[in-house]
Amino acid sequence: MGFHHVGQAGLELLTSGHPALERRPEYLEERRIKEIVKKHSQFIGYPITLFVEKKRNKQVSDAEAEKKEDKRKKKKESNDKPEIEDVGSDEEEEKKDADKKKKKSKEKYIDQELNKTKPIWTRNPDAITNEEYGEFHQSLTNNWEDHLAVKHFSVEGQLEELKDSRRVMKANQKHIYYITGETKDQVANSAFVECLQKHGLEVIYMIELIDKYCVQQLKELESKTVVSVAKEGLELPEDEEEKKKQEEKKTKFENLCKIMKDMLEKKVKKVVVSNCMEDPQRHTNKIYRMIKLGLGVDEYDPTANDINAAITKEMPPLRGGDDTSRMEEVGGSG
């Protein structure tokens, strides 16, 4: 029977009669268990121990030889006369020594801690020695050479929960809107966010790598559906008058959409009239800047602000009244 313990929980795996273990006996091997713990639980805060067998060879003196030696010493001390000792050959002496001592294999079972390397990033850097950093480096990389340097830093942000966003939403907001991206500036300057904020809607910024995966698994939160602002066909809260104007724009520019789709057939999937661009001049400036520079500059790069300002002065303003379609304005800038 083999088993191992996880902390004080006492998780015990038995070999006898368990079909899963009979099919995969390698998961009972000491080597395999250590690999799993190292891969998935190396830096767990509580100790993980494995009940292992330890063997060692030890030279144990022969009890009978020791008794004879004691008797000889006592006899020598009691006799004042010098004792004549028959000294044999070296081979005989070596044989006697070998007879006196023999090797015995000793077995011992102990609880071996598998995750000795503690999460040192949770500790104060001033309390961590260079040796501890070295041990951490070796356990993490299996590289036994000395590390070159150490940079220990800690970054913490304010913990916020998704349900807290409900408190700042307006009563007419039917969905929980979110946008994913690499930086806060990137998502905050998105045309999608600009449109929703114009309508007074709250948008959650998700800029962590894990956010995009997690939010895809979250379909609903407290009776409100979770919706990406970049989703095709995103519906915004509009009154009847706004809906009527939008339908009129779609009808008016239906032929233009078809022409643009035919011209850009291999480059675009669809051309539609959108109400998500509240400031087309701002978006056009970004496109104009990239064309001017002749390369795809990161539009959120702060080093490009000076260049952007200079180009904006050269950029002719868009023409048209408030009732002019957003698509017409963008098209007219060319």
Swiss-Prot record:
Motif (TPR repeat-binding): 327-331
Highest taxon, organism lineage: Eukaryota
Comp. bias regions, Acidic residues: 85-94
Similarity comment: family membership: Belongs to the heat shock protein 90 family.
Gene behind this protein: HSP90AA5P
Compartments, as annotated in UniProt: Cytoplasm
Bias-annotated ranges (Basic and acidic residues): 59-69, 320-334
Organism annotation: Homo sapiens (Human)
Protein name per Swiss-Prot or TrEMBL: Putative heat shock protein HSP 90-alpha A5
Keywords recorded for this protein, A-Z: ATP-binding, Chaperone, Coiled coil, Cytoplasm, Nucleotide-binding, Phosphoprotein, Stress response
Role: Putative molecular chaperone that may promote the maturation, structural maintenance and proper regulation of specific target proteins.
Pfam families: HSP90
Keyword check for Repeat: no
GO cellular component: cytoplasm
Entry keyword annotation includes Phosphoprotein: yes
Domain commentary: The TPR repeat-binding motif mediates interaction with TPR repeat-containing proteins.
InterPro entries noted in UniProt: HATPase_C_sf, HSP90_C, Hsp90_fam, Ribosomal_Su5_D2-typ_SF
Residue stretches in coiled coil: 234-267
